Amino acid sequence: MIKTVNIYDNPVLGVFATCTEDVAIVPIGTAGKAIDLLAEQLDVKVISTLINGSIVVGSLSKGNSNGFLISRDANVSDLKDVEVPVEVLPDMLTAVGNVILANDTAALVHPEMTDSSIEVISRVLGVDVHRGTIAGLGTVGMAGVVTNRGLLVHPMVTPDELSVLEDVFALPIELGTTNYGSQAVGSGLLANSKGYVAGSNTTGHELGRVEDALFFA
């Protein structure tokens, strides 16, 4: 069964798209084949839109089953078809999807995220929020992928970071890559508790690691 795809002829799915348990958000112009695959594998409604006029929807938004956040300067009308609350995150760290790693119970955010932004994240997503890094990177949304079942992270994650991740998410954690060695696993993978789709350059070995981490094996 095919579980890899490109968006805009590019395998960095997490930059262009994002997903929750209920929806996947993709940029306008995404090929019908990709939309159909996401709908089938993730068992979600697929919504096509632009965030602040941009196609990098995955970098500019982050959501879960409780709500969605979009980057400063965007408009909540960009996600008017999402059936949960949507709010703008008024933070200088504008690539919301890059700096928030979240599921339905917890979130890890860039260490420079402001207290006021953390309050917004907690309220909109309905989760406990913690600051941290993965492999020394504040872009935790690209350095990891978390569902309600498991967590896959950058292979250079440190023991101290793993300990924090275990405390925050209380989930099993695996290390891996996507797209033929990309350590920024969040850039090459969309996943929820029902399924996953990876970038087209992802190898069979990498897909196996994804399935182990997120309990699809």
Curated annotation (Swiss-Prot):
Source lineage: Archaea, Methanobacteriati, Methanobacteriota, Stenosarchaea group, Methanomicrobia
Record keywords: Initiation factor, Protein biosynthesis
Record gene name: eif6
Molecular function as annotated in GO: ribosome binding; translation initiation factor activity
Protein name: Translation initiation factor 6
Domain of life: Archaea
Family per record: Belongs to the eIF-6 family.
Protein role: Binds to the 50S ribosomal subunit and prevents its association with the 30S ribosomal subunit to form the 70S initiation complex.
Keyword Zinc recorded: no
NCBIfam families, per the entry: eIF-6, PRK04046.2-1
GO biological process per UniProt: cytosolic ribosome assembly
